[in-house]
Amino acid sequence: MAENKWKERNDLQQKRAISAEVARLSGLFAGLDSKKAEVVEGLIREVAFMRIQLEELKVKLLSEGFMITMPQGKYEIQVESPYSRAYATMIQRYTTAIGKLMELLPKEVAGMVDDGFDDFVDSR
């Protein structure tokens, strides 16, 4: 997938990519209780959409650059690309949303390491 990851996708490919990302993220939250699952479901869809859109914006930025040249009368000026602005805004929102999702992940209970102490006490 790394080869075509940076190519533009058509609408159907985008929908499939979003669905795949939703499935991937949903798998991480499979053990959630039903109340949290309802909250997480919508957030997962939004995060999946943002991730795919960020990839699309990245394709545009890699091909067109972060700056564009605009004619201003007799001279030209360099201004920030609209894709650059959109990417910067969306990456902040994506980071916030993914952080919220990570907070909702079930906490893994650290397994107790058997150090043999219980066996020692039981044997006395």
Regions inferred by a protein language model and the residue ranges of each:
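Helix-rich interaction surfaces within compact, conserved domain-sized segments
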Residues: 77-109
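Low-complexity, intrinsically disordered regions enriched in charged/polar residues
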Residues: 12-19, 23, 91, 95, ...
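Protruding loop/beta-arch "assembly-hinge" segments enriched in small, turn-prone residues
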Residues: 108-124
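Extended, surface-exposed interaction regions
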Residues: 1-83, 120-124
